[in-house]
Amino acid sequence: MAQFYPGSTKIAENRRKFMNPDAELEKLREISDEDVVRILGHRAPGEEYPSVHPPLEELDEPEDPIKDIVEPTEGAKAGDRVRYVQFTDSVYFAPAQPYIRSRAYLWRYRGADAGTLSGRQIIEARERDVEKIAKELIETEFFDPARTGIRGKSVHGHSLRLDENGMMFDMLRRQVYDEETGRVKMVKNQIGDEFDEPIDLGEPLDEETLKEKTTIYRIDNIPYREDKDLLEIVQRIHQLRSEAGFSPE
């Protein structure tokens, strides 16, 4: 069995669940395929997928045994262009966070490239593949409408204080809390273009549920120093890397 992540705390357990492709993610909301297309903003709903090359079955390419071993994704088969979805995760108990996203993406999704920054995480893939990936990431416990942002640009806000409704700061105000319904609406796509009709992302998770689901160690929940198994592994790696770098005799 793969050793996804060390540790004996709930945080470590949550991280292993995200990384393990055999672990079923809890579905928390329903987002239509059309709304996923609208959120991404790469093409109009109903528009044909633009392509960068003919379908693979129409290409006359040299024999390559690797092609018989590796099954192409649906997007690769069709010749789709490469597109992306990018998420920002609040440090205040967001379910996911950038490095865990990268490791989870590379375990769970084929034909995808993940890029990690301090407060946001991008995944690139063929267009119809990235739509499928984005749908799963938004509908499941990877996402919370208040603490997770879908942001293609102007991503900042992950480390800023939450507002009075527990919403993470977003200078473009793509996700808005409706005080009458207690639900979050997405009023702009990931790059800030306004929708004609908002998209309902559902109710934010309460604080206790977020603390139960988060993959972030925090002093006001579960500090990483309480996870002795994790510390032992991290310290061992650090020691071995340091000693190897100094080339001790």
UniProtKB/Swiss-Prot annotation:
List the catalytic activities from the record: coenzyme B + methyl-coenzyme M = methane + coenzyme M-coenzyme B heterodisulfide
BP-aspect Gene Ontology terms? methanogenesis
Name the enzyme group at the top EC level. Answer: transferase
Amino acids binding coenzyme M: 120
The cofactor named in the record is: coenzyme F430
Instruction: Report residue spans for region: Disordered.
Output: 43-62
An example Gene Ontology CC term for this record? cytoplasm
CDD domains according to UniProt: MCR_gamma
Q: What is its EC number?
A: 2.8.4.1
Stretches that traverse the bilayer:
none
InterPro entries from the UniProt entry:
Me_CoM_Rdtase_Fd-like_fold, Me_CoM_Rdtase_gsu, Me_CoM_Rdtase_gsu_sf
- UniProt cofactor note: Binds 2 coenzyme F430 non-covalently per MCR complex. Coenzyme F430 is a yellow nickel porphinoid. Methyl-coenzyme-M reductase is activated when the enzyme-bound coenzyme F430 is reduced to the Ni(I) oxidation state.
The record's Gene3D superfamilies line, in alphabetical order, gives:
Methyl-coenzyme M reductase, gamma subunit
Q: In which pathway does it act?
A: One-carbon metabolism; methyl-coenzyme M reduction; methane from methyl-coenzyme M: step 1/1
**Primary localization:** cytoplasm
Picking any one GO molecular function of the record gives: coenzyme-B sulfoethylthiotransferase activity
An example Pfam family from this entry, by short name, is MCR_gamma
List the keywords (alphabetical).
Cytoplasm, Methanogenesis, Transferase
Functionally, this protein is described as follows: Component of the methyl-coenzyme M reductase (MCR) I that catalyzes the reductive cleavage of methyl-coenzyme M (CoM-S-CH3 or 2-(methylthio)ethanesulfonate) using coenzyme B (CoB or 7-mercaptoheptanoylthreonine phosphate) as reductant which results in the production of methane and the mixed heterodisulfide of CoB and CoM (CoM-S-S-CoB). This is the final step in methanogenesis.
Q: Oligomeric state and partners?
A: MCR is a hexamer of two alpha, two beta, and two gamma chains, forming a dimer of heterotrimers.
Protein name per Swiss-Prot or TrEMBL: Methyl-coenzyme M reductase subunit gamma
Name its species: Methanothermus fervidus
Question: Which gene name does the record give?
Answer: mcrG
